[in-house]
């Protein structure tokens, strides 16, 4: 049964402007440690791809927060929600700490898709109750 659906579109120019003001502090606030390592490697090699990576993660976490009906309030937090990729490239949501406990206690599972273009990143999340 569908528990919730969330979607988000993110303007890469907005992410770039925030990054210009806050620098790596912004990436640390939004990304898990594993995501930060991927972002750092991509940014050093291809700055535009690093920005797109940051924007897709921001967008996916916003969409997830909407799908679970919490928005950005506890137990939902940026760093407890990680968007990883399977070897095939498929994005998956990996939860940590309090958020993982909250999610599992409700018997939920999530599906995520992300996309990015020149100026936008978008995400769609479907959460099911098993």
Swiss-Prot record:
Location(s), subcellular: Cytoplasm
Cofactors required: Mg(2+)
Pfam assignment, any one: ACPS
Record SUPFAM superfamilies: 4'-phosphopantetheinyl transferase
A GO MF label: holo-[acyl-carrier-protein] synthase activity
Domain of life: Bacteria
Top-level enzyme category: transferase
Record's catalysed reaction(s): apo-[ACP] + CoA = holo-[ACP] + adenosine 3',5'-bisphosphate + H(+)
InterPro entries listed in its UniProt record: 4-PPantetheinyl_Trfase_dom, 4-PPantetheinyl_Trfase_dom_sf, ACPS, Ppantetheine-prot_Trfase_dom
Functional note: Transfers the 4'-phosphopantetheine moiety from coenzyme A to a Ser of acyl-carrier-protein.
UniProt-recorded name of the protein: Holo-[acyl-carrier-protein] synthase
Organism for this UniProt entry: Variovorax paradoxus (strain S110)
Highest classification ranks of the organism: Bacteria, Pseudomonadati, Pseudomonadota, Betaproteobacteria, Burkholderiales
